[in-house]
């Protein structure tokens, strides 16, 4: 080997070592599926990063109604947008004029329909509405997260059900049993948070949630259990069996590798991309983990690890066929990521300039996210003192794309112990 070749080889080795130290093991050695997709993706959002501006006129709530706290918002394949709210969270004097918990609007904000709120044969309507999804066939899926006395304004039996309805609100099916607790059951949930229905394989993915630390999968037609898994594909542990942090404000990315081996509480959202990658929003650990739909861990990204506000609350994809951008909900801002590389490209200011931040009940925004067919972004939550009214969700109109400037911070270099995931296969139905 010549002297020049020796020098080049040494420089390459030093460069590889530096990259490994900067990104941590999971990022330095991405699995082949993610690595291949990354090579195809525009680097740093080549062509620009989406820019948004809040639309104060969306939605147009009928004047006779008051809207409870907005829990979820989602776009459907017809171009309309749905809001799930919590009527029981309204002050008592407003509950007689509460808007229905499920409402559909067009992109201009015009009201189309509303329904829900009452229990019926075979199901209990949630005490505390949480997750919402409209699948490609038009079925509407909701769930609640009341657990005993926690998040239970109506003091009803625990929610712990996924409910499937027709587009106009006729009950179809329930997954789980109301009045039960989930533990690690294959058919009962515990504080589930959101739903995604993958019509390509007829599966329902549930982020479960506040009581359990897992993704759990059911058949979309029968509700039969298929499989489940936890962080890195590990067997999930219940809340009371998870390692505890030493203190409430302990930095969860420093010397807590044992904690990181499980999803934090709550595991708050789940989405599956067009190229069949599953994204899990681990709010408890401020990260997004990526899996195959059968539970094989691929990679992860931490968002806002040094911020005190809640992060990794919700997920949404840009509507282009390649779903180039991944939006990750946070408070008070949402994050814009290159979906295939997980590089952080920028943020969306979800609280208007000069609006209140940190005041109770005024800026609990970004609870869950949605997008419509034109690429506009929506957040569920509340900005009541900004607009002087409650409306459940807010529209951020896509105004164009800006030149790409590297933003924010690189992924944290988590400890070698946490990086050594020891990923396992998902637990499947026998």
For the regions a language model picked out, list residue spans one by one.
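Eukaryotic scaffold repeat domains enriched in small/polar residues
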Residues: 7-8, 22-430
